[in-house]
Amino acid sequence: NTVGGHVGWSLPSGANARQMFEQPRKAYVLMGLEPEFDCANPQLVVGALKQASLVVFMSAFKHAAALEYADVMLPIAPYTETSGTFVNIEGRAQSFNGVVKARGDCRPAWKVLRVLGNVLNLDGFAYESSEAVRDEVIGKGTEFVAGLDNGLNGVAINLSPVSAGLQRIADVPINFADPMARRAPALQQTADSVAPAARMNEKTLSKLGVSAGVPVRVKQGLGEAILTAKMDN
């Protein structure tokens, strides 16, 4: 739902996510995010969260690691248990209903945010349904979202040359990309969920004096992992 997020004003007018962790804030609200797995620099993010005075953690799952930094944990329904709208890459709005009723005290995330807005006496939190949220974002009765293009507007990528050492190109397996997939036993047994490996060109392995198939310690910043070296030309 990346297009839906863009249409729904997810691009901030102020600091972006990285800046909010590089310059720690006093309070954070996390929704459906497990920073240890979902952020490119988890050490930076978790460090900022532990410094904060207040962290509100909203998730469909009780994430054990979040107990170290979350002050409040609010249960929200997964997308399968709530109504809503996705906008696909074509720009087509696709609305749906929940497959089953949310369990226990879980509520759809939009309802939790609405109540928080009401408690804080903020304007713009009077929604009574997910359809009302949709209609405000894309317009009532909209089938295709207008004004989309393939341009990379407002995005600047500055890459500094590396004179020494190695660069890590990380791949996130499709069945490890979100909290629900990570907790699906059947998905974790597929070929797409094999253990990660340190893949290197044959010449790089030779230069490092490493043989394919042996365990190697990979470090970046304060993090490290033991991976199996594999030749990949």
Give the positions of each predicted feature.
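A cross-kingdom feature strongest in bacterial/archaeal respiratory oxidoreductases
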Residues: 2-105, 112-114, 119-123, 131-233
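Metal- or metallocofactor-binding catalytic centers and their adjacent structured scaffolds
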Residues: 127
